Amino acid sequence: VGSLGYGVGSLTEETKSLFSTTGPGVDIYAAGEYIISATSTTNKFSAPSYYGNASFKQTNISGTSMASPQVCGLGALHLQANPHWTPAQLKDRLTKDAEARLQDGGLTAYSTHTNIMGGNNRIMLSRYANAVPFSSNVAGLKKR
């Protein structure tokens, strides 16, 4: 999973993040810059209290560790609707449903003339607004 610039403050929206790898192992990209995330109260980065509650804080974090959970969450929704899928089928669905629309935000480690060498696929969460059915084995739980 690679990171792309997205969100408030990003100067490279819809472009591969400069810190994200460009190698052939990257099959899909998701937003990974300026993601609001929870953080501990002892975090070395300055983080404001969440609505004045000092027991936990939030901050903007950038990295592929912010992009990966989005791809995993989308994969989990697919597996909920299709529990018989193999890992290869899931990967195929995720990459085929993505849009090939990214640009490389900077020079790659492989060549100064080569754009993203792996997949240039950006996940499109909006495509799944109502596509995955809700199911649960918890009694009394209903979709709103």
Task: Map each language-model feature to its residues.
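Catalytic-core segments of hydrolase enzymes
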Residues: 1-40, 93-100
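Short, electropositive, low-hydrophobicity segments enriched in small/polar residues
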Residues: 6, 27, 67, 77, ...
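C-terminal subdomain of the subtilisin-like protease fold in secreted/lumenal serine endopeptidases
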Residues: 7, 15, 80-144
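Residue-level signal for the start and early helices of compact helical domains
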Residues: 10, 19, 26, 52, ...
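Alpha/beta-hydrolase superfamily serine-hydrolase fold, recognizing
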Residues: 17-20, 43-45, 132-134
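Short glycine/serine/threonine-biased micro-segments
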Residues: 21, 61, 71, 116-117
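Weak global preference for isoleucine
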Residues: 28, 35-36, 61, 116, ...
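Hydrolase catalytic cores
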Residues: 32-111
